[in-house]
Swiss-Prot record:
rRNA-binding is among the record's keywords: yes
Listed SMART domains: Ribosomal_L14
Alphabetical UniProt keywords: Ribonucleoprotein, Ribosomal protein, RNA-binding, rRNA-binding
Protein name: Large ribosomal subunit protein uL14
Keyword Ribonucleoprotein attributed: yes
Task of the protein: Binds to 23S rRNA. Forms part of two intersubunit bridges in the 70S ribosome.
PROSITE patterns, per the entry: RIBOSOMAL_L14
Length: 122
């Protein structure tokens, strides 16, 4: 469950290391985002030679949350951290590698490229 001012790890090699959620996209009064949702975020920590710089406003898709997500079959899945992958206007990832496992729900939301780059899909 991600809301404004939540800080997330960046799970790709775009150059950003930590982002802070500014807005959850999808509805005027939408409060929370879960796995597979798109957020607008500000970059709080970044590598000095990366594509993304500190202070930049980016869009990102959430790939891991500490709050459990219920699946269609009734099972629950949760992760150790909150993480996101930075995307461009065409919903393609900016980075070329994804670090750590991602939830299967990301594929169902239409992010096949992110799923194919991930080392493990749970």
């Amino acid at each position: 469950m991600i809301q404004p001012f939540t800080r997330l790890k960046v799970a790709d090699n775009s150059g950003a290391k930590e982002i802070m959620c500014i807005k959850v996209l999808g509805g005027s009064k939408r409060r929370y985002a879960s796995v597979g949702d798109i957020i607008v975020a500000s970059v709080k920590k970044a590598l000095p030679n990366g594509k993304i710089k500190k202070g930049q406003v980016v869009k990102a898709v959430i790939v891991r949350t500490k709050k459990e997500v219920q699946r269609e079959n009734g099972s629950l899945i949760r992760f150790d951290d909150n993480a996101a992958v930075i995307i461009d206007a065409k919903k393609e990832p900016i980075g070329t590698r994804i670090f750590g496992p991602i939830a299967r729900e990301v594929r169902y939301e239409g992010f096949q490229k992110i799923t194919s780059l991930a080392p493990e899909v749970l």
